[in-house]
C-alpha cells in the first residue's frame, strides 16, 4: 500500500470512528438510562442497635432494602463476582468472549447451555425490563455500555445488590438476607447464601 493509500485509509477510519462516537452520543441522548429513584425501596423501622423492627414493602409491593457493597459480606460479593462475572472490573460492560462462548455452545448443543451476560448486562435487564430475545440481548448490550459510560463499577454493583430478584416480591441481597436467613447481609457468609439462588 502506498503512502497516499495509508493516508486515505487513516482518514476513512478516523471519519468512521467519529461517526460511531456521534451516533453513540445521539443514542445516549435519545434513550436515557432508566435509573431507579434512589429514595425508592421498602420502609424499615430500626431499633437503636440497627435491627429491623418492622418493614413495609414499597409502593409496588416489593421488599427492597437499600444497601451498599461495603454493607454486604465481602465473602458474598467475592462469591457473586466469581460465579456471575469474574471479569467485572476488567470489561466495559460487555464480555465478547463470554457472548461468543454462549453462542457457540448454543449452536453445538442446540439449546442454551450457559449465559454470556455480564453483571452490568444483568443490571441493564433488571432496570430496562428487556425481553429474552435477540433484540432484547442487543438492547441489553447497548444499555450495559451506557451504564458503564455513566456509572462507576461500584455504582453498578450497588444497583445489582439492590435490585437482583430473589424470588417473589423480594429484591436485593439485604431484603433476601433478612427474608430467608433472618440476619443482615453483612453477616451473611457465601456458603449460607449463594449467588446461585438468583
Identify the meaning behind each predicted range.
Residues 1-198:
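Juxtamembrane regions of bacterial inner-membrane/periplasmic proteins
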Amino acid at each position: 500500500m502506498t503512502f497516499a493509500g495509508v493516508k486515505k485509509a487513516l482518514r476513512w477510519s478516523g471519519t468512521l470512528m467519529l461517526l460511531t462516537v456521534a451516533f453513540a452520543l445521539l443514542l445516549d441522548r435519545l434513550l436515557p438510562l432508566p435509573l431507579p429513584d434512589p429514595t425508592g425501596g421498602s420502609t424499615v423501622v430500626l431499633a437503636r442497635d440497627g435491627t429491623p423492627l418492622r418493614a413495609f414493602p414499597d409502593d409496588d409491593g416489593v421488599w427492597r432494602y437499600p444497601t451498599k457493597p461495603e454493607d454486604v459480606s465481602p465473602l458474598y460479593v467475592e462469591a457473586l463476582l466469581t460465579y456471575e462475572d469474574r471479569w467485572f472490573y476488567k470489561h466495559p460492560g460487555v464480555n465478547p468472549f463470554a457472548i461468543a462462548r454462549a453462542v457457540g455452545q448454543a449452536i453445538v448443543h442446540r439449546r442454551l447451555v450457559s449465559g454470556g451476560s455480564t453483571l452490568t448486562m444483568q443490571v441493564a435487564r433488571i432496570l430496562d425490563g428487556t425481553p429474552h430475545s435477540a433484540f432484547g440481548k442487543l438492547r441489553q448490550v447497548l444499555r450495559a455500555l451506557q451504564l458503564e459510560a455513566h456509572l462507576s463499577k461500584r455504582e453498578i454493583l450497588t444497583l445489582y445488590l439492590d435490585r437482583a430478584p430473589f424470588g417473589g416480591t423480594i429484591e436485593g441481597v439485604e431484603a433476601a438476607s433478612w427474608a430467608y436467613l433472618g440476619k443482615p447481609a453483612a453477616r451473611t457468609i457465601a456458603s449460607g447464601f449463594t449467588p446461585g439462588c438468583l
